[in-house]
UniProtKB/Swiss-Prot annotation:
Native organism: Haemophilus influenzae (strain ATCC 51907 / DSM 11121 / KW20 / Rd)
Protein's name according to its UniProt entry: Uncharacterized protein HI_0938
Domain of life: Bacteria
Subcellular location: Membrane
InterPro entries, alphabetized: N_methyl_site, Pilin-like
């Protein structure tokens, strides 16, 4: 008799392994606050860089506005061309088309929150597309006890510092 496995034995073994993995992977893939914050931080950073590039290409001043509703745990960002009327990302219907508004809505809206002294209708910062500068400000993105500090510098740079926060941003 030859040593080896039949096709039926191999298929039964694969079925057992796939059933075991089916139960193990969802438990392993649950998002921790650190993972949630890292994903949200990455998406938000890409949005900010996109708006910065848009401001540079348009040679205009763009506002960045943060809005949040603590009662419903909602928050969002609006980027728009400088205008007397500012857009509210929690109520985008009233936003005029001439401001070319771009909205950022969080991937984890109920698990993350944003903190800043400059909440809608005040802008958090301005991207100057002519000079490639940004008004120096900061805000904090938080998921439970994990925090990330977003810093805007007047030389046009955006920095992200994980698990650090500036007392001026609280």
């Amino acid at each position: 008799m030859q040593k080896g496995m039949t096709l039926v034995e191999l298929l039964i073994g694969l079925a057992i392994i796939s059933i075991a993995l089916n139960f193990a992977v969802p438990l392993w893939k649950t998002d921790s606050p650190k993972t949630i914050l890292a994903k949200e931080q990455h998406r938000l950073y890409l949005f900010l860089r996109q708006i910065q590039a848009r401001a540079e290409n348009s040679s205009e001043v763009w506002f960045l506005l943060i809005n949040r509703n603590l009662a419903t745990q909602q928050w969002c960002l609006t980027a728009q061309v400088k205008n007397n009327q500012t857009c509210d990302c929690l109520n985008p219907i009233n936003c005029p088309k001439e401001v070319y508004a771009h909205f950022y809505y969080p991937y984890f809206p109920n698990k993350t929150m944003i903190q800043s002294h400059h909440i809608y209708p005040k802008e958090i910062t301005r991207f100057d597309g002519i000079r490639n500068t940004i008004v120096t400000r900061c805000f904090i993105l938080q998921a439970e006890n994990e925090r990330t500090l977003f810093l805007f510098f007047n030389v046009g740079s955006i920095r992200v510092k994980t698990n650090q926060f500036d007392s001026a941003c609280n």
